[in-house]
Swiss-Prot record:
InterPro entries documented for this protein: Ribosomal_bL32, Ribosomal_bL32_plant/cyanobact, Ribosomal_zn-bd
Cross-referenced SUPFAM superfamilies: Zn-binding ribosomal proteins
A GO molecular-function annotation: structural constituent of ribosome
Superkingdom per UniProt: Eukaryota
Signal sequence segment: none
Name listed for the protein in its UniProt record: Large ribosomal subunit protein bL32c
Organism: Oenothera elata subsp. hookeri (Hooker's evening primrose)
Length: 51
């Protein structure tokens, strides 16, 4: 018989949320850094065709 799961505590929920936010922050920082280097032409590791 199916039994409902226990409720996740607020602190655990908050911890998971901050981990997710931190990962998103670093991903956006990397993407912005890459975009900046591409726009200035300083990129050495990212290959793309210049028009």
């Amino acid at each position: 018989m199916a039994v409902p799961k226990k409720r996740t505590s607020i602190s655990k929920k908050r911890i998971r949320k901050t981990i997710w936010k931190k990962k998103a922050y670093w991903a956006s920082l990397k993407a912005f850094s890459l975009a900046k280097s591409l726009s200035t032409g300083n990129s050495k590791s990212f290959f793309y065709s210049k028009f």
